[in-house]
């Protein structure tokens, strides 16, 4: 499966108004330095000590938003 990884700070910039809000991210344990990744389906996963947890998802045209903000492309 392909992902783009980023920090919580970058995720905050990407998330649209009709998606997760700051309080939702904080409740899921996401802070500025948290490592997160998004797959091509828009699922947001947060890095935990022993794996990854899905905490929500992005909607619509998130592909361009992610690639523009991170400067990265999808990686296996």
Language-model segments: residues:
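Acidic, low-complexity, intrinsically disordered interaction modules
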Residues: 17-67
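Mixed-charge, Lys/Arg-enriched low-complexity segments
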Residues: 1-11, 51-76
